[in-house]
Amino acid sequence: MMALLQRVTRARVTVDGATTGEIGTGLLALVCAEQGDTEAEADKLLAKLLKLRVFADEGGRMNRSLQEVGGGLLVVSQFTLAADTSGGNRPSFANAAPADTGRALYEHFVARARAQHGEVATGRFGAMMQVELVNDGPVTIPLRIPPASAA
């Protein structure tokens, strides 16, 4: 399972003109389930995300986690993170989990995030979404927990 994290001062996702999720300071996590992923990979990814030290401490060093700063978490499903662009000019998404598996893992990830962290907002799985953000830094970090079958 993978995520592209962006440290933000604010972020919002809308579907059909209606806001489905919005946060202030925190992390925007674009999340993708890959072929072979299970809840175990989702849990490991979430644990890493919540503890990743990407926020400044008193000295200005990236030394504090999302949990430590009490920031928001906006989780948006994005299967295109699994794109394979090695052949030709059209990306292949064959590495992404099937839609039903992707939805189940996304919902599991969000449920666990809500159980472990205070402020969690989301997009809508499978919808055409517009994501607005102000990237702070900019800080953008890819995370990937490979499926156990690929290890």
Curated annotation (Swiss-Prot):
EC number: 3.1.1.96
Cytoplasm as UniProt keyword: yes
Signal peptide: none
GO molecular function: D-tyrosyl-tRNA(Tyr) deacylase activity; Gly-tRNA(Ala) deacylase activity; Ser(Gly)-tRNA(Ala) hydrolase activity; tRNA binding
Any single Gene Ontology cellular-component annotation: cytoplasm
Cysteines joined through disulfide linkages: none
Catalytic activity: glycyl-tRNA(Ala) + H2O = tRNA(Ala) + glycine + H(+); a D-aminoacyl-tRNA + H2O = a tRNA + a D-alpha-amino acid + H(+)
SUPFAM superfamilies: DTD-like
Keywords: Cytoplasm, Hydrolase, RNA-binding, tRNA-binding
Locus of motif Gly-cisPro motif, important for rejection of L-amino acids: 137-138
Gene3D superfamilies cross-referenced by the UniProt entry: D-tyrosyl-tRNA(Tyr) deacylase (3.50.80.10)
Chief location of this protein within or outside the cell: cytoplasm
Subcellular location: Cytoplasm
GO biological process, one term: D-amino acid catabolic process
Enzyme class: hydrolase
Domain notes for this protein: A Gly-cisPro motif from one monomer fits into the active site of the other monomer to allow specific chiral rejection of L-amino acids.
UniProt function note: An aminoacyl-tRNA editing enzyme that deacylates mischarged D-aminoacyl-tRNAs. Also deacylates mischarged glycyl-tRNA(Ala), protecting cells against glycine mischarging by AlaRS. Acts via tRNA-based rather than protein-based catalysis; rejects L-amino acids rather than detecting D-amino acids in the active site. By recycling D-aminoacyl-tRNA to D-amino acids and free tRNA molecules, this enzyme counteracts the toxicity associated with the formation of D-aminoacyl-tRNA entities in vivo and helps enforce protein L-homochirality.
The protein's assembly and partners: Homodimer.
PANTHER family per UniProt: D-AMINOACYL-TRNA DEACYLASE 1, D-TYROSYL-TRNA TYR DEACYLASE
Similarity section: Belongs to the DTD family.
Protein name: D-aminoacyl-tRNA deacylase
Source species: Azoarcus sp. (strain BH72)
Gene, per the UniProt record: dtd
